[in-house]
């Protein structure tokens, strides 16, 4: 087997809408071991379906770029009909069509040698990442067909105390930063 150069380590996280049959990107955050970061929110997300999902509207949507103050200063808020009301700030430079995100993520991850990808509970994250380009076989050349799972690493380190989270949970870029912080503390990535 030929030697394949091992490139930089990237920690990433996605937030997504899933219904047991499909998984759709809401946002993606990526942190490279060299300090570069990427964060984007999918302007093509299915707003109506997300507005019906209590968990997403309580845990993910508040961390997205939102416009306006909402009802009584709350954005998102639950209407009398039981539906969540919120408005994505489409003027934010973080909000982009999925095809733009796919191109930018490809360029970001393949800027150097083939990347080594890491995520926390990585299975769904890798599917969401791969679906930026369609089917798994459509992954851009150089992107791995798997993501290393932080939880599997932590299982092998019985006495390891992982660092506390600094930021907000279910915010893709903050979650990716935390994964990188854990990888550094575990000795998988040199200290910055």
PLM feature spans:
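Hydrophobic, well-ordered secondary-structure scaffolds
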Residues: 1-3, 14-21, 160-164, 183-186
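Short, flexible loop segments at boundaries between secondary-structure elements
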Residues: 141-162
């Amino acid at each position: 087997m030929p030697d394949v150069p091992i490139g930089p380590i990237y920690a990433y996280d996605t937030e997504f809408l899933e219904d047991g049959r499909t998984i759709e990107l809401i946002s993606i955050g990526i942190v490279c071991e060299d300090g570069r970061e990427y964060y984007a929110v999918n302007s093509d997300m299915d707003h109506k379906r997300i507005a019906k999902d209590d968990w997403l509207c309580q845990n993910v949507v508040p961390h997205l770029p939102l416009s306006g103050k909402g009802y009584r200063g709350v954005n998102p808020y639950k209407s009398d009909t039981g539906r969540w009301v919120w408005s994505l700030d489409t003027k934010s430079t973080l909000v982009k069509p999925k095809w733009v995100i796919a191109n930018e993520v490809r360029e970001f991850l393949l800027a150097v040698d083939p990347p080594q990808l890491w995520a926390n509970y990585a299975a769904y994250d890798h599917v969401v990442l791969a679906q930026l380009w369609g089917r798994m076989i459509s992954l851009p050349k150089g992107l791995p067909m798997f993501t290393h799972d932080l939880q599997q690493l932590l299982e092998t380190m019985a006495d390891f105390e992982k660092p506390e989270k600094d930021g907000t949970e279910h915010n893709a870029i903050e979650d990716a930063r935390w994964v990188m912080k854990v990888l550094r503390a575990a000795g998988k990535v040199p200290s910055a």
